[in-house]
Design a protein with these regions (language model features):
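Conserved Walker A/P-loop ATP-binding site and its immediately adjacent core
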Residues: 34-53
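The conserved Walker
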Residues: 11
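Conserved glycine(s) of the Walker
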Residues: 14
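Walker A/P-loop NTP-binding motif
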Residues: 18-29
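Structural recognition of the conserved hydrophobic beta-strand(s) that form the central parallel beta-sheet
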Residues: 37, 103-105, 132, 136, ...
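Conserved RecA-like ASCE ATPase "motif II neighborhood" in helicase/translocase motors
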Residues: 69-141
Length: 248
């Protein structure tokens, strides 16, 4: 089967860490369950690649093996990539991706169809590209004949730059193009900051949708001794006076 999961969490709850844990724990080439962690945040990817490269060299030495930093970096780059490099690779290559599991960090920042088409035409010289970024990325994993998993790590209200679609673009892509995929959603995706309520309702009418409380990370690791802090801030931003007063 093919499944797409949406993981939500308060700021600092560790969504990126969850994605990295999945990616690093599923590297078994023999079992065919390798994963790739994808992010559009280049500074983050650079830091992660460097840190994991150094760690790989140290671990190999502790195990009595020798590996150069260049060799270690190549292995790390296989499972932590810039999302645009991944996209460009499978524009050129029509085969199914090497990985069966793809984790998209900050999935809400994927591009709309208009932004993606414009970029492909102006920067890549591709005039017949007609997908939003979520549509194309899901289509890559959909090339697998047996199974595939997409994990979207979602930050609420964190669409920052021009053309960033929000999580509704992913939900619309599933509804319109990949309705045979099973969908697992954090119930918190209904919250106002995700602006996805209407898209979820449409998706429920057409697709196999299941809600799972475990897909929400509720406590910020930055303030783990004040577990209600994030909820308090949310209630204030939602102008929920009663809830804010109670929590305060």
């Amino acid at each position: 089967k093919k499944i797409i999961c949406f993981v939500t969490g308060v700021p600092g709850a560790g969504k990126t860490l969850v994605g990295l844990k999945v990616a690093t724990e599923h590297l078994d080439k023999d079992k065919g369950n390798t994963s790739v962690f994808l992010s559009g945040n280049k500074p983050l990817v650079d830091i992660l690649q460097e840190a994991l490269t150094r760690d790989r060299v140290i671990q190999e030495r502790l195990n009595g093996s020798k590996i150069t930093k260049k060799q270690a970096r190549e292995s790390v780059k296989a499972f932590i990539q810039i999302i645009h490099h991944y996209r460009d690779e499978y524009l050129r290559d029509p085969k199914a991706p090497y990985d069966h599991v793809a984790i998209f960090d900050e999935a809400q920042r994927a591009w709309t169809k208009d932004q993606t088409v414009k970029f492909m035409h102006q920067k890549k010289g591709i005039s017949n590209f007609q997908y939003s970024e979520p549509e194309f990325l899901i289509s890559c994993l959909n090339r697998h004949q047996d199974w595939a998993v997409v994990i979207c790590l979602v930050g609420g209200g964190q669409e920052i730059n021009t053309g960033e679609a929000g999580i509704s673009e992913w939900l619309s892509a599933i509804e319109n193009q990949f309705s045979d995929w099973e969908t697992r959603i954090s119930p918190n995706l209904f919250d106002s900051e995700y602006a996805a309520q209407t898209s979820i309702e449409h998706l429920k009418q057409k697709c196999n949708v299941e809600f799972n409380d475990s897909l929400h990370l509720s406590v910020s690791m930055r303030s783990f001794r004040a577990e209600y802090l994030s909820k308090l801030i949310k209630e204030i931003l939602d102008i929920n006076e009663n809830a804010s007063f109670t929590l305060n």
